[in-house]
Amino acid sequence: MRRILKRHDVLADEWRLFGEEAAGAVDSGSDALIVPLAELRKDTAAWLARPGRLGVRLAPSESVESLSDVLPHLTLVAVEFPGVGEGRGFSYGRLLRDRLGFTGEIRAVGAAVKQDKIFLLARCGFDSFELPPEEKADEALAALRRYDVVYQPAEPIEGIERQRFFA
């Protein structure tokens, strides 16, 4: 089972990925399902009409702006980080929060989600992280709390949000 770092806790993932179930059909009725953007675009209306929570998985080669029409219907956007040299996802987090006004969960997923990037991803608007199997949960949690003072402005973190990330 996938491990998710969220709100200073490591949790079992409550979301399923499209294709994990045998059928993988639009009308599967599963409560929380993440589908690739390409799959969502095959029949957007059917996916948006399905019961339960819907998330989309965004590859580095796909445009964040292409989500603008469906974003109000999504609960989660999972941004892929397939390799260490791929940094577009950092910008995707900021674009989702600042330009598109997405208030749902933004999750960093992929092999390159490592403890050295978690704090920086949080500053770019990410609020959950899928930990690769080789990552140690306690070290990932420590990485999120590593700095309590920053010198450059980024994602505005105020009030209860600040307490959540820096407590």
Language-model features: locations:
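Short Lys/Arg-enriched alpha/beta "domain-start" segment
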Residues: 2-20
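Glycine-rich phosphate-binding active-site loops on the catalytic face of alpha/beta enzymes
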Residues: 124-144
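C-terminal helical cap(s) of enzyme catalytic domains, especially alpha/beta-barrels
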Residues: 138-167
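A positional/architectural concept
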Residues: 16-57
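Acidic (Asp/Glu)-rich catalytic clusters
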Residues: 44-51, 65-74
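Catalytic cores of alpha/beta
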Residues: 64-69, 113-131
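Short beta-strand/loop segments at the ligand-binding rim of alpha/beta enzyme cores
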Residues: 49-56, 95-109
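Active-site-adjacent beta->alpha loops and helix N-cap segments on the catalytic face
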Residues: 38-46, 84-97, 137-147
